[in-house]
Amino acid sequence: MSENIDEPFVTDELRKLASIATDMQMTGKMRSHAVDQLGEIGSHEALLVLLNLVANDKLNVEERDLALKRARDIVKKGR
């Protein structure tokens, strides 16, 4: 099986975006932008990160709703 050369980069990028999206010291705008970027990545791994954000009760309802919307968009693209 061939290994995807970009995989370590994507995984690191997902971790960074997830960290930003959950960092309550950041502005809401920055957290929302991180969620949007996760949606743009559109991979299965990004979908899982977004679903983890949806389940995170430390985020406010609007941020969780945005993560759910972006996750839904990824699922729709996969059809």
Each language-model region and where it sits:
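Buried hydrophobic core positions in alpha-solenoid tandem helical repeats
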Residues: 14-18, 49-51
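Alpha-helical propensity feature that highlights long, continuous alpha-helices across diverse contexts
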Residues: 35, 51-54
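Short linear motifs at secondary-structure transitions and domain/linker junctions
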Residues: 14, 25-29
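Short, charge-rich amphipathic alpha-helical segments embedded
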Residues: 43-49
